[in-house]
Amino acid sequence: MSATWFKGSCHCGAVKFEVRTAVTPATRCNCSLCRRRGALMSPMFAASELKIVEGEGALTCYQFNTRTARHYFCSHCGIYPFHQTRMNPACWRVNLGCLDGVDPYALDATVANGASLSVVEDA
């Protein structure tokens, strides 16, 4: 699937964004954080393809292990809408469940071996 523009938001609507991304191939990650949050992620895209429309101040950033990746969460509802990747910090991924008109349960997903990237602690 080719990249297209989507509108998206967190659960409470405090964070709204637009993103140009493909939906497939969708990916799950097996690192310690992703196993717990259970999100289905888009393919990687350039940072310039993500535009925060509303609520940038409501975002909180979480980092762990090498502290290269930046995982963003809404400080009101706790939903993870997107993150800056560790493998390539110039690239991002979006939580496909946050995109308007996308059913993440209708998509097949591959599993990324994020657990193998841990160099500091178990992942």
Predicted features along the sequence, with ranges:
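A short Gly-Trp-Pro
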Residues: 1-9, 14-123
